[in-house]
């Protein structure tokens, strides 16, 4: 999508793909954490669990209820935050009229990220939701090139 639709050069495509991919993946992990862990899948990397003093080898359901899970989520979120910032910087430098779908997608995931960040990383349920009006606003923002990029 980055190279074909947005017509970025090879280097920009590779870097944006890496940054956007990381930001979106982490946002999804943080957004879906309860369902994933209840399904037996812990996608937060071990380094962040260890930094939050969550013991290695703990059962998934015990990680879900661990008092320090919010610390691991907050630290993991910093990686997404820096990826969003770098992606926005690169998009700003390489913006063209064909990059609007990329800007919209990044704005959408960033909006989910911001909802979680504002309410606090200790809150895992319910999953954040964007209202229809908010999604429409994000489309207009991308089309009119306001905010984000």
Language-model features: locations:
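Catalytic cores of Mg2+-dependent Asp-rich isoprenoid enzymes
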Residues: 3-23, 30, 34-149
């Amino acid at each position: 999508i980055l190279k074909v639709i947005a017509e970025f050069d090879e280097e920009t495509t590779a870097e944006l793909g890496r940054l956007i991919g990381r930001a979106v993946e982490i946002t999804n992990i943080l957004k879906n954490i309860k369902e994933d862990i209840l399904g037996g899948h812990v996608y937060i990397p071990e380094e962040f669990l260890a930094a939050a003093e969550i013991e290695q080898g703990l059962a998934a359901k015990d990680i879900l209820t661990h008092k320090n899970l919010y610390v691991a989520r907050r630290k993991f979120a910093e990686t997404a935050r820096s990826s969003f910032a770098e992606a926005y910087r690169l998009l700003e430098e390489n913006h063209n009229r064909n990059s609007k779908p990329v800007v919209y997608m990044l704005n959408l995931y960033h909006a989910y990220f911001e909802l979680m960040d504002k309410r606090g990383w200790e809150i895992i349920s319910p999953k954040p939701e964007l209202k229809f009006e908010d999604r429409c606003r994000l489309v207009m923002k991308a089309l009119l090139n306001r905010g984000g990029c």
